[in-house]
Amino acid sequence: MTKISAGCGFSLALRSDGTVWAWGLDNVGQLGNGSTASSAVPVKITALSQVTSIAAGLDSAVAIVAGGASVWAWGGNDSGQLGDGTTAGHATPVRVTQIGTVHIAGAAAGFKFAAILGTDGSVWAWGADNTGQLGNAPAATPATRPVNTIAAGSGITQIAAGVDHMVALKSGGTVLAWGDNTNGELGTGTTTPVTGPVQVTGLTTATQVAAGVRASFAVHVPQPPAIVPALAGDTQAQAGQALQAAGLVLGTVAKVTDKFCDHLGLVLSQTPRPGTAVRPGSAVSITIGGPPPNGCP
């Protein structure tokens, strides 16, 4: 087995030979084998082959076929979650339509909606949109065909779906989220739903994302610390350049009287001290020598 995905009362497994097997509840055809008889043992979805990825939702599922050439869906469809332009359920896979020439890199399935990620960084979603989970603001009636949530070239590398929300990982390590936010699952610092992608607060070096029922998760790799350089004897301009090179910024610049006028315009002290390990982007304050009130001797 190369991948397992669990829905509500049923499960899917993808084998290395590209076949998909399903077991559990089958009241609306979510096992994909043409019947609505639940099964306590895995049954093969014979209509599928060359499958490279799977995702199970509440009562429906999606599969990526032929390395991303197409995406297929089956099961319940009362909110259009199969993406075939109808709201009729299907006990065998049907092709998701109207995604143009997008080559598919990943798929996700939520409560009554599903989404795909294109290799071009675009995100497409369909199904229920009661809390903005399709991300194409404003929230609206269900979409029975894919709508474009995020345009190509966005840098999105992974998507994940919760009950009524989604998260997306960008190549630079930031994370976007949209949809329901009743329990703060969007990570924005509020509980207000959002109908279009917004950046999750505080995540800048994430490497993986996942979404649960009412929560979101990210693997976050902390940045290595920045080391404060020695700035004594530098001019303010030189200090700023040295800090920038170290991944830091210039903070407060104070002036003290240099009564002998031999360090005018030069850094006399700094905070934090040289060699201190700090968070990248931190500010370093400096003190610069200035002339006496009555001028230099």
What are these regions (language model features)?
Residues Q223-P297:
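Ligand-recognition elements built from short beta-strands and adjacent flexible loops
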